[in-house]
């Protein structure tokens, strides 16, 4: 299987994973030019998704691509997995802290730990 076909398969797998978790609009993005308006997958609001389905990943290169392509308009992530492994998500620590702080606090200052 060539890398383009494997990439497309990974994008479909990630979109299906997102749909299984309640993001029913998740699907592959438009694959014609790169950039903010054409991430690998769409359907997670405010997240620019770079999807990698490879056995060996240079995570720093993949993050640089996601950061560059999101043009500062979304939180860049890299969702990646190897054969027979679970999905992992890589993101900048500053972005993770923003999301985590929002998750643990609501208007009354309660902490949510599901």
Where are these regions (language model features)?
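Catalytic phosphate/metal-binding cores of nucleic-acid and nucleotide-processing enzymes, i.e., regions
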Residues: 1-114
């Amino acid at each position: 299987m060539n890398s383009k076909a494997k990439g497309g398969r990974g994008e479909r797998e990630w979109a299906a994973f997102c749909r299984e978790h309640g993001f029913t609009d998740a699907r592959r993005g438009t694959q014609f030019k790169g950039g903010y308006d054409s991430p690998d997958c769409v359907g997670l609001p405010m997240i620019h998704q770079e999807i990698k389905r490879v056995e060996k990943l240079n995570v720093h290169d993949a993050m640089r691509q996601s950061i560059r392509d999101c043009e500062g308009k979304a939180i860049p992530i890299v969702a990646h997995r190897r054969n027979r492994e679970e999905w992992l998500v890589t993101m900048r620590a500053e972005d993770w802290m923003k999301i985590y702080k929002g998750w643990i606090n609501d208007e009354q200052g309660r902490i949510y730990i599901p």
